Structure formats: structure tokens, C-alpha cells
Design a protein with these regions (language model features):
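A short, sequence-level motif marking secondary-structure junctions
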Residues: 40-44, 105-107
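Core segments of cupin and vicinal oxygen chelate
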Residues: 1-37
């Protein structure tokens, strides 16, 4: 899939996809990013949603956020996982879409 996007749309990616950096229109000093990554059609990574995509949000204080989401009866799919580049957890929205919450390290 990545080869198709590179050949046809010029989108160069790594095994982790690619990142588009941008600036806030009302505060150009403030930056953000959007990540794009294609997964194989038979991936299990988006389970249990059954949808062919996943939304990922950067968050602060993931442990506190998960505690609040549990109080609101939000479906928490897994336990918080910690890696060199941050903490992650997955939740489901009311329509069953999987959402990855990411607290980057040192941000």
C-alpha cells in the first residue's frame, strides 16, 4: 500500500507512516502534526472496532484521562502501555470506532 501512495501521490513513508507538521493559523508559533499510516487490509490492529481506520489523539496526563473516561463508562480496550516514545491506550467511541490516545514523552 505504501508503494502505491509513493508512486501515485508522491507520499514517502517509513514503516510507521509519515507525519505532516503544521502551524496554528491564529498562533503560528504553535505547531501540531497529523500522522498517516497505511495498514494491511487484514490487520487486527483496529480490533475490536471492525472498522478499517483508527483515530489517534495526542493527550496530556493519560493516566488521569483514563480514570475520568472510566467514570464516564467509556469502553477502555486495553491497559496503558508505555514505550520509549510515550504512553498509549485504546478506547471505543459510542459508534464503535477505535481511538488511540497517545501521551508523547517529554511534551
Amino acid at each position: 500500500m505504501n508503494e502505491w501512495y509513493a508512486k501515485n501521490l508522491g507520499l514517502e513513508t517509513s514503516e510507521y507512516g509519515t507525519t505532516f507538521e503544521w502551524r496554528h493559523a491564529d498562533d503560528p508559533a504553535k505547531t501540531g502534526s497529523t500522522s498517516w499510516c497505511a495498514f494491511p487490509q487484514d490487520t487486527k490492529y483496529f480490533n475490536p472496532s471492525g472498522k478499517p481506520f483508527m483515530i489517534n489523539y495526542r493527550v496530556e496526563n493519560l493516566v488521569e484521562l483514563v480514570a475520568e473516561l472510566k467514570k464516564e463508562n467509556v469502553t477502555i480496550v486495553d491497559e496503558i502501555a508505555e514505550y520509549d516514545y510515550g504512553k498509549f491506550v485504546h478506547i471505543l467511541d459510542p459508534e464503535g470506532n477505535i481511538i488511540e490516545l497517545w501521551e508523547p514523552k517529554n511534551e
